[in-house]
Amino acid sequence: MSSGANGNSKSLAYDIKFTKLFINGEFVDSISGSTFETIDPATEEVLATVAEGREEDVDLAVKAAREAFDNGPWPRLSGEARRKILLKFADLIEENADEIATLEVIDTGKPFQIARYVENSWTSETFRYFAGAADKIRGATLKMSSDFQAYTLREPIGVVGHIIPWNAPAYLFAMKVAPALAAGCTVVIKPAENTPLVGLFMAYLSKLAGVPDGVINVVNGFGSTAGAAVSSHMDIDAVTFTGSTKVGRTIMQAAAASNLKPVSLELGGKSPFIVFDDADIEKAAEIAVLGVLSNKGELCVAGSRVFVHEGIYDAFVKKLEATVKNWATGDRFDAATRHGPQNNKQQYEKVLSYIELGKKEGATLVTGGKPFGNKGYYIEPTLFTNVTDEMTIAKEEIFGPVIMVLKFKTIEEVIRRANATTYGLAAGIMTKNIDIANTVTRSIRAGSVWVNCYLALDRDTPFGGYKMSGFGREQGLEALEHYLQVKTVTTPIYNSPWL
């Protein structure tokens, strides 16, 4: 692969403006002066040297957020006032869409078409959605069975820590920050160390939008230091995390050991995509590929276990192979490209090791399975067939461009096998039979089930997992619940003039 084919010239030409921490409305160096490098996954070259926040920097950010919450205007503004600022924030995201998308491309490796025309739209619209909720947070009046009356207040929980992963930094920033701000909370954000650039640019836009100082704070750094400080901080009132189940467990332990702060977790997945024998084979193959190869397979919801009815297995595999081979890999800034490099070297090597393990355990490698080009963390879109449930690639989350096909006979069998996982994030069903669709939908233990589609996400649809895929919901009005507390106010009604 030539340098032009992997986006090298575009990466080097881009001027990265923000590399420091963002605390109390200002870009500042870390207290220790420590820095780290962020790498372009397409070129393996350094994009920028970024300030490295540690425990003392997190503490400074929390103090700013606490002051902004306890004594600042944000939680005391009317919902209408917060709405206007969040709408301005959304407008600025839209106006700076090219710059945000470029940062996302060079920091994550995803194709520009996805970053610019899919995820950037989701990001701005998520802020608009929760802006619309800011002035609609209300309590209830309660009629008690005694000489008292009561009503409830739904109040912001306080300072929230957000730990954001590297696969979709702009969109996940919006998913976490927008509802927290709409509720009246202040936030401390720890972006992934592999993708710090988007969060810093979003912090800059928040200042332009009129978000008061201290309401949004961004501390770049590593999970073992900055992330651990967020999850264990005694003055953070709640925390959210998207990432691996292993790290999610660590965050829960830290939250419990500190101040028992509530935690919302969106964790790993090994989602089933079930194709019944009445499905449109061509459409099912297209959706199956979309459900795994989108974002280079770096999707928590990837429907990577593709269960196919034995009656259409051979025909489906043939169509699936052709679809995978047509998934264009190359220059991330080329409009035709659908597949870029894995985000980082560690993930690249992990995916390749799973591919080798799949071959060793007896799965049939149909296409792909090798590095692509001579530079960058590119892996060919990969398809395995003759996969069985006990194989490691069928049980563990790979988080890469690897599709595996498994054969089934009956609806009862496939439901049992689909549920035979510690995860429960999502599932897909392809069938023309409404009875089959309803039966499987109600039997699958997963937070999202897509029928005759996949990845059909929307601002109004709650998203989250069952089992070890986590708990709590993002998107939809349900997302607000993690950022609000209910207070009950009770008063006597003796001698009231209306009695």
UniProtKB/Swiss-Prot annotation:
Cited InterPro entries: Ald_DH/histidinol_DH (IPR016161), Ald_DH_C (IPR016163), Ald_DH_CS_GLU (IPR029510), Ald_DH_N (IPR016162), Aldehyde_DH_dom (IPR015590)
A Pfam family: Aldedh
CDD domains: ALDH_F1-2_Ald2-like
UniProt binding sites for NAD(+): 164-167, 190-193, 223-224, 243-248, 266-268, 346-350, 397-399
Residue positions of the active site: 266, 300
Record's subunit section: Homotetramer.
Name of the protein in question: Aldehyde dehydrogenase 1
Provenance organism: Tanacetum cinerariifolium
Gene for this chain: ALDH1
